[in-house]
């Protein structure tokens, strides 16, 4: 009973994260579109993020940096959505099933892609930022560690499914 209550709370927080990340991605995209007509908007793109220097330097670089951020937050929202789906499909009477394993692998891949996007974003921002002494807004790149851990758990669940099916066959 306690586990099911915790899972419901986790599902609520996953929905909360999903909605929040989608709002964040949408807000950045909308302010980017506004900054095309009014460069001053880039001074406070989202929550104090000032990319005005990048916009005045090169609209192309500015666009890439903003799109990295939109894609990154969208992928994070997608991962939160996968967690919601995982929690929906999770059956505590038979926790080792192919749905759980597939969702865990998808989450692991999503986090790995997130890590790649963060590295590309950070490299791009550092190349320009250091060269022209611009303020840099970097993403954490600790995603690969999390991706590996979730992938390992997915493999454990897969092994649990194999053992469970072997036991079902022997009964």
Q: Model-flagged regions — what are they?
A:
Residues 113-171:
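Alpha-helical transmembrane segments of multi-pass integral membrane proteins
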Residues 4-25:
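Alpha-helical transmembrane segments and their helix-start/interface "positive-inside/aromatic belt" motifs
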Residues 22-44, 70-74, 104-111, 166-171:
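Alpha-helical transmembrane segments of integral membrane proteins, especially early/N-terminal helices
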Residues 93-127:
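Hydrophobic alpha-helical transmembrane segments of integral membrane proteins
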Residues 37-59:
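Perimembrane loop-to-helix junctions flanking transmembrane segments
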Residues 2-9, 80-106:
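Cytoplasmic juxtamembrane regions at transmembrane-helix boundaries
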Residues 19, 23-26, 77-84, 113, ...:
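Alpha-helical transmembrane segments of polytopic integral membrane proteins
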Residues 51-76:
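Membrane-helix boundary elements
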């Amino acid at each position: 009973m306690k586990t099911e209550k915790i899972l419901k709370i986790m599902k609520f927080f996953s929905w909360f994260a999903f909605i929040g990340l989608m709002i964040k991605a949408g807000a950045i995209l909308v302010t980017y579109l506004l900054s095309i007509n009014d460069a001053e908007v880039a001074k406070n793109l989202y929550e104090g993020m000032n990319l005005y220097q990048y916009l005045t330097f090169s609209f192309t670089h500015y666009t890439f940096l903003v799109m990295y951020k939109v894609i990154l937050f969208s992928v994070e929202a997608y991962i939160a959505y996968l967690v919601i789906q995982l929690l929906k499909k999770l059956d505590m009477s038979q926790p080792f099933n192919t749905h759980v394993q597939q969702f865990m692998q998808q989450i692991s891949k999503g986090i790995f892609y997130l890590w790649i996007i963060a590295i590309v974003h950070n490299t791009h921002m550092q190349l320009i930022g250091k060269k022209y002494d611009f303020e840099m807004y970097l993403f954490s790149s600790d995603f690969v560690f999390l991706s590996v851990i979730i992938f390992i758990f997915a493999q454990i669940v897969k092994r649990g499914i194999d053992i469970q099916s072997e036991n079902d066959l022997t009964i």
